[in-house]
Every structure is written in structure tokens, then in C-alpha cells.
Amino acid sequence: MALFVFIGHDGPEGTARREQYRAAHVAALDKLDADGRIAFAGPIRDDANAASTGAVIVFDADSLDAAKKLMAHDPYVVGGVFANYSI
């Protein structure tokens, strides 16, 4: 396994969609964390007290292809929270 970094930047409807998909997103991350695959996960903010404008997730996967497939199923990705993301 190797570590990969996911960086997602919210789209114009990110805040509303984030609220809609938050519980499912957290549940998905909790499962990965329970499996020992999350090294770090947290929001991107413009300043300490601002609303989240994106996310960073550092996680373990077998390959870049596996990492892309895993993140493609994240509820925030599926729900359109992010305007763009990279791994």
C-alpha cells in the first residue's frame, strides 16, 4: 500500500451540498479510518473561522487506480460538493 493525497475544492453549491452529504461522507471516512487507511482528513478553510471550502484526505491504497476508484465513490464526490479534485 502507498499513501495518496486527495484535494477537493468546493463548487458554487458546495456549502449546501456539503450539509446534505456530510453524514454519509463522515461514515465513509470512519469506515476507512477503522480499516487503518486514513492518515489525515480535514477541511480546507480560507481562515480559521471560515466555512470549509474543500477537503484534504491522506489515505492508503494499493495503487493510484485504486485510490481514484475509492475516492470516486466518496459521497461528497458523488453528491457534487467539489467543483474539482485531484489525487
Q: How should each PLM-predicted stretch be described?
A:
Residues 1-87:
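Conserved, structured core segments of small domains
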